[in-house]
Amino acid sequence: MVFPIWPAHQERMMRQLLQALRQRPAPIVHLFRFPRVTINHAILLFGVAESEPAIQFEAYDPNIPGHPVKLIYERAARAFVLPQAHYWAGGRVSVIEVYRGGLY
């Protein structure tokens, strides 16, 4: 990744991921930080719970195969947050969907 991701893009990505979870199983997302690359990782989304302040995506993380993890979209900040894990200090991440089908 060689460019920053803006809040408006992350809001569109949140909507795209909600739609993806309704239409097909398990979208795969790339999580990263730029310009200081403190995380470069992918997870598989399989569920979602919405509330007024946030959207919590349930995900499979290959680094933590024993239980689901949460990827949180904070509506007010228009940003994704990945909680702390043994490989990550926790905090904001940029998110993009990496595979949507045979033509993408």
PLM feature segments, named:
Residues 36-40, 49-104:
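Cys-His-centered catalytic/binding microenvironment captured across papain-like cysteine peptidases
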